[in-house]
Amino acid sequence: MSKHTNVVVATLSALVTLSACSAHQQSSSSPSATSGAPAGAQTLSAELHTADGRSVATATFEFANGYATVTVKTTANGILAPGLHGMHVHEIGKCEPNSVDPMGGPPGDFMSAGMHYQAPGHTGEPPSGDLSTLDVRKDGAAYLVTTTDAFTRDDLLAGNKTALMVHGGEYGPDAEKRIACGVIGTG
């Protein structure tokens, strides 16, 4: 055999061998039923609603290996205004529209959730409940995955539980507005 024939035979043999290694699977357009969380992860969730009761987003908190993976996904487009929105865990698991902060003050939407959550033993800034900013697209949709080691599953469920809050903006006057809230729980 010539040198050229040897190269062709070797190449074809390699292709046949490699094709036997690849799985013949059809692609799927359906979402995966598995989570990105490590095996054995403990999960909490929250359904976020506006003050008028419209569903805005779902959130999951997956705890494994000493940190939480927080995933927030809008459930309906066009409810949240496009742009950056502050997002925090608040200290009380209540999401009541037109309510008063437990420490007093004027009524407002979701004030019953109290202040930003601070884990036991943590006194510094930023508060333990501060999360990454939610960036809402022009169509009103958003999807965020972030991680934190500032709190544990047990921290979020202790005492009065906790709530996840989306604010009207990241900075400025809208940052204080509470526009969506969901109580964090096991189901």
Features from the language model and the residues they span:
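N-terminal leader/targeting pre-sequences
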Residues: 2-84, 89-187
